[in-house]
């Protein structure tokens, strides 16, 4: 999403699934959850935006760009299809 560069920074709230200081897994899971949510409910579904804000706050831009490219090519490792 192009809004990333214009949106204000914010701190992501606590998530009990990721109590460790290292938030790499939280970043990955939020990216996957966002795309799963969008595939099931559509981009305008407000709860999906929580995952979008989380992964944009936690994940390095290089990772996001790489994952976006992988999704476009159909080689993304995560399961983002609706179950």
Swiss-Prot record:
Keywords: Disulfide bond, Membrane, Mitochondrion, Mitochondrion inner membrane, Oxidoreductase, Phosphoprotein. Pathway: Energy metabolism; oxidative phosphorylation. It is found in: Mitochondrion inner membrane. Component of the cytochrome c oxidase, the last enzyme in the mitochondrial electron transport chain which drives oxidative phosphorylation. The respiratory chain contains 3 multisubunit complexes succinate dehydrogenase (complex II, CII), ubiquinol-cytochrome c oxidoreductase (cytochrome b-c1 complex, complex III, CIII) and cytochrome c oxidase (complex IV, CIV), that cooperate to transfer electrons derived from NADH and succinate to molecular oxygen, creating an electrochemical gradient over the inner membrane that drives transmembrane transport and the ATP synthase. The Cx9C/Cx10C motifs are involved in the recognition by the mitochondrial MIA40-ERV1 disulfide relay system and the subsequent transfer of disulfide bonds by dithiol/disulfide exchange reactions to the newly imported protein. Component of the cytochrome c oxidase (complex IV, CIV), a multisubunit enzyme composed of 12 subunits. The complex is composed of a catalytic core of 3 subunits COX1, COX2 and COX3, encoded in the mitochondrial DNA, and 9 supernumerary subunits COX4, COX5A (or COX5B), COX6, COX7, COX8, COX9, COX12, COX13 and COX26, which are encoded in the nuclear genome. This is Cytochrome c oxidase subunit 12, mitochondrial. It comes from Saccharomyces cerevisiae (strain ATCC 204508 / S288c).
């Amino acid at each position: 999403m192009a809004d990333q560069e214009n949106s204000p920074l914010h701190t992501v709230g606590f998530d009990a699934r990721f109590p460790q200081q290292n938030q790499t897994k939280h970043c990955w899971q939020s990216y996957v959850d966002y795309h799963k949510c969008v595939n099931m409910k559509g981009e305008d579904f407000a709860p999906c935006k929580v995952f979008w804000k989380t992964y944009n706050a936690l994940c390095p831009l290089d990772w996001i760009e790489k994952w976006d490219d992988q999704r476009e090519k159909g080689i993304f490792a995560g399961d983002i299809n609706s179950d």
